[in-house]
Amino acid sequence: MAGQQFQYDDSGNTFFYFLTSFVGLIVIPATYYLWPRDQNAEQIRLKNIRKVYGRCMWYRLRLLKPQPNIIPTVKKIVLLAGWALFLFLAYKVSKTDREYQEYNPYEVLNLDPGATVAEIKKQYRLLSLKYHPDKGGDEVMFMRIAKAYAALTDEESRKNWEEFGNPDGPQATSFGIALPAWIVDQKNSILVLLVYGLAFMVILPVVVGSWWYRSIRYSGDQILIRTTQIYTYFVYKTRNMDMKRLIMVLAGASEFDPQYNKDSTSRPTDNILIPQLIREIGSINLKKNEPPLTCPYSLKARVLLLSHLARMKIPETLEEDQQFMLKKCPALLQEMVNVICQLIIMARSREEREFRAPTLASLENCMKLSQMAVQGLQQFKSPLLQLPHIEEDNLRRVSNHKKYKIKTIQDLVSLKESDRHSLLHFLEDEKYEEVMAVLGSFPYVTMDIKSQVLDDEDSNNITVGSLVTVLVKLTRQTMAEVFEKEQSICAAEEQPTEDGQSDANKIKAKGGWQQKNKGPKKMPKSKKKKPLKKKPTTVPLPQAKQQKQKQANGVVGSEAAIKEEEDDISDKGSDSEEEETNRDSQSEKEDGSDRESDREQDEKQSKDDEAEWQELQQSIQRKERALLETKSKITHPVYSLYFPEEKQEWWWLYIADRKEQTLISMPYHVCTLKDTEEVELKFPAPGKPGNYQYTVFLRSDSYMGLDQIKPLKLEVHEAKPVPENHPQWDTAIEGDEDQEDSEGFEDSFEEEEEEEEGGD
């Protein structure tokens, strides 16, 4: 537009507003995310768990790790400098004068709004005498006073002030840019262009490009996409993977390849040390040629993993590489579990026979290998080796004991304290207390299972093809809590038995002679007799008396006989009346019982409706909580003697058919189980009615021998037939018929009107 000019900030006042906002947008989020956490809290936490986790490798590495004292200090200095700059700019903004102020003639004349004309004239006289230029006053102030007086007394000036905010009428409004004028100065144009070019043409493309290059190489779980492709190929190729094959495929991940991961290193000494470890292990097949499983980096990772599972001592130059490899194993095994599940889903969706799904054994071997990698144990080793001070030498004393045959952690926990102490007599008191402390920290998880069909009238009735929802409630306790409860129960059971034995001894001591004289009596079995119904019986008179009465006065006898007959008739009538009344009372009772049964049914139905409504509300609340809450994945640290990183307790939960060796529901990775957790497992019901027996598995990804198994029985019924007639449909049809009738009536009425008009 012609004549348009941009006004930049010459004074720098408006630029301070922009600069303050910009600095605040940087400093506030940076303080939240970059302010160093309290190191003392971490030290206190490590001190509190030292009794249990003091022998773990990750605990010792955490203590040996040098504390980063310089980096937190630098962060604090930078953030504090940013806050100082922000506060300085805010103070500067608060002290700057406003360039645009609304014109108010009352303020110029030092009057309150709404002053009268007389007050205005009086104040004008006083101020004009004071600021008149002829009397040595301020000329500018005098002009402002005259302008304000005219705005309040002159009709036209007052109207302009009320409408436009100025007694002189509408004025030109100017808008400025909150940037200093030196930025657009011709002298500084080259410098400004260089800064803009560096920021938007070099720095920004480099940042976006590096982020994009990284994002296309990694998946959402920070696993290389090339690794996922390798796992998918070999899992599909080998349908049933044993443990050796699984370790071989795991070691082929691109995370261990220096070409794709800079954190992975390859040293010249590996050509000497790795063959030595291969000879010591002695169970590695080097004849197959399956790249990348036979590449040098994959072979190195496999050897380091096998040496870790065998708890072998390796050279110090390889320890760092082994720790790096072990830290990657849990995430890689979780990715392999996901790949197996995806292939199973693809096999179910496709009806091609050539597409073969991985077996359930392959999936369970992946989960088993995760436990082995965390605990540093081979496949068939005893779970008791997870405990401290229990090694191969003294394990035989525990597992091959004559009285107690202890094979699992649960067997050791189920013993009494005295038996446990005698079994572990080869340990010193301090070591025994440490073993008990570690054993008490192990998790004990219970499962409560409930199967139902959501969004159905009869949620407990499972029909063919319905979507079954299995609600599993997990409750985590420690082994210490479990054997504390068992000890209290045992003590409560022993007390009454001891009291009973002492009472029996007292009785024997006092009255032993009574027991000698009196033998044990056998009580006859009492049989319950059925109550007999009493019939009305008439007592007959003796014959001699009857004959005497008849001979003495026959008339009286005849009258008496007549009276007796009348009494018999009256008795029969009374009996019939009693029977009728009994029938009436029975019918009334039956009616009352029917009413009571109806009431009971109504009450039962109302209770069922309330229970269903409560379950529905609970499910809705559960879903809302799952959507809104973001639970932390920090649950409980795992006791692992040879794992180099602190790991949290996580679990896999799934349903399988052990008989058919098929996976029913996909594994759910439970990462937030602290105390209790509710998990929903969904799967389609079988296609045929009948009784089905499944198994719910809860497998740990860190501990060996602590898996939980619970049976799940399903009774599948035929699907309900689709109703052909429904009252709602009848009303809809009637409404359509009424509408058609009304339309037909309107058409006939219109035709009659047209005929009448034509006749006219």
Swiss-Prot record:
Residues 492-617, 720-760 are annotated as: Disordered. It is found in: Endoplasmic reticulum membrane. The chain crosses the membrane at residues 15-35, 70-90, 189-209. The modification Phosphothreonine is found at residue 537. Residues 1-14, 91-188 are lumenal. The modification Phosphoserine is found at residues 742, 748. The keyword Coiled coil applies. Residues 104-165 form the J domain. Residues 518-536 have a biased composition (Basic residues). Keywords: Chaperone, Coiled coil, Endoplasmic reticulum, Membrane, Phosphoprotein, Protein transport, Repeat, Transmembrane, Transmembrane helix, Transport. Its main location: endoplasmic reticulum. It is a multi-pass membrane protein. The keyword Iron does not apply. One of its GO terms (cellular component) is membrane. CDD domains: DnaJ. Residues 36-69, 210-760 are cytoplasmic. Disruption phenotype: Knockout mice exhibit very early embryonic lethality before E7.5. Conditional ubiquitous or kidney-specific knockdown results in polycystic liver and kidney phenotypes, respectively. Mediates cotranslational and post-translational transport of certain precursor polypeptides across endoplasmic reticulum (ER). Proposed to play an auxiliary role in recognition of precursors with short and apolar signal peptides. May cooperate with SEC62 and HSPA5/BiP to facilitate targeting of small presecretory proteins into the SEC61 channel-forming translocon complex, triggering channel opening for polypeptide translocation to the ER lumen. Required for efficient PKD1/Polycystin-1 biogenesis and trafficking to the plasma membrane of the primary cilia. This is Translocation protein SEC63 homolog. The lineage of its organism: Eukaryota, Metazoa, Chordata, Craniata, Vertebrata.
